[in-house]
């Protein structure tokens, strides 16, 4: 699954190899609390080189593979949803400055509704303050690649991404 997602990302980005190699460190299957497995996609900062639309492609492919392999959806806990909201808000406020900033409620909707886990490796020295030491989130530091995919990929390109997913 991981190799297929990375290969498709190379094709989509027309050979910008930093995006699939460094921006998508790995994909794995992780357990939900009910025992089902879900697709867990790890992003890093270099995913930015893919562009906002292409950065979401791994989520579409991961969801497609999830369905083919009869895997479960990612079911985040309430704490994980709040962690996404806090972490991406810190990223939007303290790491990058954008004209449009997603609200905490928008971030919660995305975190709760994504069928695959948008995860990531730590890319910033900043740490989150409230929702720390969660078992399925490997770090307390801000994960820039995850935040990029949520804000610039899902948040800004949702309609375009949905049209791809339906095809």
Please tell me what each predicted stretch does.
Residues 1-167:
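Extended, Lys/Arg-rich, non-catalytic nucleic-acid recognition/anchoring regions
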């Amino acid at each position: 699954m991981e190799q297929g997602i990375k290969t498709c990302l190379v094709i989509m980005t027309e050979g910008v190899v930093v995006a699939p190699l460094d921006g998508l460190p790995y994909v794995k299957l992780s357990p939900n609390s009910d025992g089902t497995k879900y697709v867990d996609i790890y992003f890093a900062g270099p995913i930015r080189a893919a562009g906002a639309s292409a950065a979401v492609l791994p989520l579409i492919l991961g969801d497609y593979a999830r369905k083919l392999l009869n895997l479960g959806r990612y079911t985040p806990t309430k704490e994980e949803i709040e962690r996404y909201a806090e972490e991406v808000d810190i990223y939007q406020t303290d790491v990058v400055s954008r004209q449009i900033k997603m609200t905490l409620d928008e971030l919660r909707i995305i975190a709760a509704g994504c069928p695959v886990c948008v995860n990531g490796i730590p890319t910033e020295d900043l740490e989150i303050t409230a929702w720390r030491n969660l078992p399925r989130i490997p770090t307390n530091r801000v994960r820039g690649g995850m935040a990029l995919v949520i804000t610039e990929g899902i948040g800004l390109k949702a309609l375009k991404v949905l049209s791809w997913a339906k095809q």
